């Protein structure tokens, strides 16, 4: 982030109202998000900025965001051909040769989402706590269980999101991962618990 801000003669406060800067930041976040998917073996990785994704539209209605998905995290695909762009501008799709998800959106639009807790909870927790850079992002991390990004999504998601902030404590976005609930159920089968009243503790 620091390099992108420096190259664009910008400050972190500019994220709040500069849609063009935000799209530049997101384009540079593509590789880190791909690495997150591969290293964590998850279906989704996303970053949502604390600023607008469209010119002349406030962040509260259309936030700048990049949301990637793979339906098969355990398989290898050359040139990341398994990845879908769920949220992100077309320029990112063209630059990285990404197929668009069936319900693709250019920005994170809360009014179109079935549930926004994966963003709202860590975002508001950090703001309300007047968080400082001395604490770890995980102090405001939030697990969201069995939700869907959009009502028409086929798979229920489990997500984990944390706030992003700089050394002075300025909140500039949310970073998170997601995986299909059915994937977790497949590796933690209920049959393994037997009849003894056991349970899985996550």
Predicted regions and their residues:
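GAF sensory/regulatory domain recognition
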Residues: 49-109
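Extracytoplasmic/periplasmic ligand-binding sensor regions of membrane-associated signaling proteins
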Residues: 88-178
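Short regulatory "switch" loops immediately downstream of catalytic or recognition motifs
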Residues: 3-8, 50-55, 124-131, 165
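Structured segments of extracytoplasmic/periplasmic soluble domains
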Residues: 4, 32-39, 48, 69, ...
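Loop/turn elements at helix/coil->beta-strand transitions in domains of secreted/extracellular proteins
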Residues: 40-44, 167, 171, 196
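Juxtamembrane extracytoplasmic/periplasmic/luminal helical "stalk" adjacent to the first N-terminal
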Residues: 1-34, 38-43
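Solvent-exposed, extracytoplasmic
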Residues: 28-32, 174-202
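Short hydrophobic alpha-helical segments used for membrane anchoring or interfacial signaling
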Residues: 45-53, 198-202
């Amino acid at each position: 982030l620091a390099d992108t801000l420096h190259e664009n003669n910008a400050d972190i406060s500019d994220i709040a109202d500069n849609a063009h800067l935000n799209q530049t930041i997101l384009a540079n976040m593509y590789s880190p998000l791909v690495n997150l998917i591969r290293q964590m073996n998850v279906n989704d990785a996303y970053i949502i900025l604390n600023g607008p994704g469209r010119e002349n539209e406030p962040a509260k209605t259309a936030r700048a965001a990049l949301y990637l998905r793979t339906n098969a995290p355990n398989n290898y695909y050359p040139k990341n051909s398994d990845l879908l762009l769920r949220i992100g501008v077309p320029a990112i799709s063209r630059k990285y040769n990404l197929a668009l998800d069936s319900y693709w959106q250019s920005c994170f639009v809360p009014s179109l989402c079935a549930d926004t807790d994966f963003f709202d909870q860590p975002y508001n927790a950090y703001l309300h706590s007047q968080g400082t850079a001395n604490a770890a992002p995980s102090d405001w991390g939030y697990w969201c269980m069995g939700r869907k990004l959009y009502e028409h999504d086929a798979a229920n998601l489990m997500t984990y999101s944390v706030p992003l902030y700089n050394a002075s404590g300025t909140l500039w976005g949310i970073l998170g991962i997601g995986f299909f609930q059915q994937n977790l159920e497949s590796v933690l089968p209920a049959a393994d618990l037997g009849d003894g009243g056991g349970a899985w503790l996550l």
